[in-house]
Swiss-Prot record:
Lineage: Bacteria, Pseudomonadati, Pseudomonadota, Gammaproteobacteria, Pseudomonadales
PANTHER family: MALIC ENZYME-RELATED, NAD-DEPENDENT MALIC ENZYME, MITOCHONDRIAL
Residues that, per the record, bind NAD(+): 155, 268, 417
GO molecular function: malate dehydrogenase (decarboxylating) (NAD+) activity; metal ion binding; NAD binding; oxaloacetate decarboxylase activity
One Pfam family of this chain: Malic_M
Record GO biological process: malate metabolic process
Organism of origin: Pseudomonas aeruginosa (strain LESB58)
Keywords: Metal-binding, NAD, Oxidoreductase
Residues binding a divalent metal cation: 244-245, 268
Subunit note: Homotetramer.
UniProt name for this protein: NAD-dependent malic enzyme
Family note: Belongs to the malic enzymes family.
Cofactor: binding comment: Divalent metal cations. Prefers magnesium or manganese.
Swiss-Prot/TrEMBL site (Important for activity) positions: 268
Length: 564
């Protein structure tokens, strides 16, 4: 416990209003003296409980829920009533509850957002209110915001346009910043930019709570986002802004436009890339190989897939390859087949990842020929297969067996979310490779039994990366998030892998260890920020103390009454 946590907190609120503040409410844990000082006598049952007793009751209530969506709603209701209790409950049951508060259950919660809505959380900034964004930000109840997660809800997981229902993603992401990275919930703010929706189900739903209008696009959209960014810079100039679940047509341009203007990153592009590269590095270390020796095939060439590919290329260059050599080891397969330089429909960020058809030799065919996934596997002979397509079943038995025929221990990463969109299940992949493949998935899966072996499945979850990035940025007050910082995070994650540290187990650490993993990532990120001049340099001792000081634990502090 830090010295700050031991000191009393001076609180100017009292009575029912105090009980209605999730960041301050202790419920039945208010002491006798606090009940007197804060005019709470008679507003709570007589018995005074510890947080351990409250957590036990909450968990027993949680177990009465019948469905995962019911469990999600229950946990969110606790969060909206008592954040300390919510995060204590998560701390004690993180592996069990993480799939409930985030993927895959959060996908359904986003789809049902208007139907299950209970109370406000975060900010809803709609296009019709674009001239009042400064006023909206000033109305936020949190003054010392250090991390904002913002979405426009156009590409929620693999579910597409969910309108304001996408707010479930920033809420869930920030819950993980706290549960996994120790970021105080007092420092976090979820935001949804309501620019309308093109989802006809929502437009025709009488219960839909968002702006009932087709999506704003083009120059109007860009102007609106810029109004938001500039207002954020005025309100919280040192904030870390995370872009979340923007469509690929906007995600990369927004990142490129603002990455040198404020401290920001896109988790779908850069966070996904960092955890994927960390997974690859761990697998390579375990096999005694180099990343630069691998050949990687992607299924899905959107912004997430291309972001991963670019970071792999950068990592290969750090191992000695030149850029051209590294790019020749990356094969991007999309709905039209392998991306090649003679295609006329490539997006801007895809051009640099397209293979030169002339370099493919006989199997490259003629200009205009589509090269399907199986053909790419058969001829490129990859050692790594990554799925970010959102299409169930694309990793067929024929594809996986072909992959295994030339690579004894391939790394297969079906990363699409939610579970219903995964390219292949771990059970299928391991059955088709005689239990030899290394598997990491985007959604959580139970261990797989293959013969007499029980094989744990690593969830290639961005939660291994972004909480540590946030903690490191906050600890040293970094003013930017750089590619070097993301690479430092990936390397730190790889060094925590059980198959690296113990020679067996999953490719990634157990979720139960994620808070310690986040601290190690925070140290690596902070040191890299200092090395690049993005933060003031300190000694290692001062840096470690700063990380510990910023690491919040869900414990109640004693309260003292004060006036405004």
């Amino acid at each position: 416990m830090t010295e700050t946590a031991k000191r009393p907190l001076y609180v100017p609120h009292a009575g029912p209003s105090l009980l209605e503040m999730p960041l301050l409410n202790k419920g039945s844990a208010f002491s006798t003296q606090e009940r007197i000082d804060f005019n709470l006598q008679g507003l709570l049952p007589h018995n005074i409980e510890t947080i351990e007793e409250q957590t036990e009751r909450a968990y027993s209530q949680y177990n009465l829920c019948n469905t995962d969506l019911d469990r999600h709603i229950f946990l969110r209701s606790i969060q909206d009533n008592n954040e300390t209790l919510f995060f204590r409950l998560l701390e004690e049951h993180l592996e069990e509850m993480m799939p409930i508060i985030y993927t895959p259950t959060v996908g359904q919660a986003c789809q049902e957002f208007s139907k299950i809505y209970r109370t406000h959380r975060g900010l809803f900034i709609s296009y019709p209110d674009r001239e009042r964004i400064d006023d909206i930000l000033r109305s936020a109840t949190k003054n010392n915001v250090k991390i904002v997660v913002v979405t426009d809800s156009e590409r929620i997981l693999g579910l597409g346009d969910q309108g304001i229902g996408g707010m479930g993603i920033p809420i869930g992401k920030l819950s993980l910043y706290t549960a996994c990275g120790g970021i105080s919930p007092a420092y976090t703010l979820p935001v949804v930019l309501d620019v309308g929706t093109n989802n006809p189900d929502l437009l025709n739903d009488p219960m839909y709570m968002g702006w009932r209008h087709e999506r704003v696009s083009g120059a109007q959209y860009e102007e609106f986002v810029d109004l938001f960014i500039q207002a954020i810079k005025r309100r919280w100039p040192n904030v870390l802004l995370q872009f979340e679940d923007f469509a690929q047509t906007n995600a990369m341009p927004l990142l490129e436009r603002y990455k040198d203007e404020l401290c920001c990153f896109n988790d779908d592009i850069q966070g996904t890339a960092a955890v994927a590269v960390g997974t690859l590095l761990a697998a390579c270390k375990a096999k005694g190989e180099k990343l630069s020796e691998q050949t990687v095939t992607f299924v899905g060439a959107g912004s997430a897939g291309c972001g991963i590919a670019e970071q792999i290329i950068a990592a290969m260059q750090l191992e000695g390859l030149d850029e051209a050599q590294a790019r020749r080891r990356i094969f991007m397969v999309d709905r039209w087949g392998l991306l090649t330089d003679d295609m006329s429909n490539l997006l801007d960020f895809q051009h640099r990842l397209a293979q030169k058809r002339a370099d493919l030799g006989a199997w490259g065919g003629q200009q205009g020929d589509d090269l399907a996934l199986l053909e790419v596997i058969r001829n490129a002979r990859p050692t790594v297969l990554i799925g970010v397509s959102g299409q169930r079943g694309l990793f067929s038995e024929e594809v996986i067996r072909e992959l295994h025929s030339h690579c004894k221990q391939p790394l297969v990463m079906p990363l699409s979310n939610p579970t219903s969109r995964v390219e292949a299940t771990p059970q299928e992949i391991l059955n088709w490779t005689d239990g030899q493949a290394l598997v990491a998935t985007g959604s959580p899966f139970q261990p797989v039994q293959v013969g007499d072996k029980r094989i744990p499945i690593a969830q290639c979850n961005n939660a291994y990366i972004f909480p540590g990035i946030g903690l490191g940025v906050i600890a040293v007050r970094a003013n930017r998030v750089t590619e070097g910082m993301l690479m430092a995070a990936a390397n730190a994650l790889a060094n925590c892998s059980p198959i690296v540290t113990q020679g067996e187990g999953a490719v990634l650490p157990a979720l139960g260890d994620i808070r310690e993993v986040s601290k190690r990532i925070a140290v690596a990120v902070a040191k890299q920020a200092q090395a690049e001049g993005k933060a003031l340099h300190t000694s290692d001792e001062v840096l470690n103390d700063a990380i510990e000081a910023n690491f919040w634990f869900p414990r109640y502090r004693a309260y003292r009454r004060t006036s405004f």
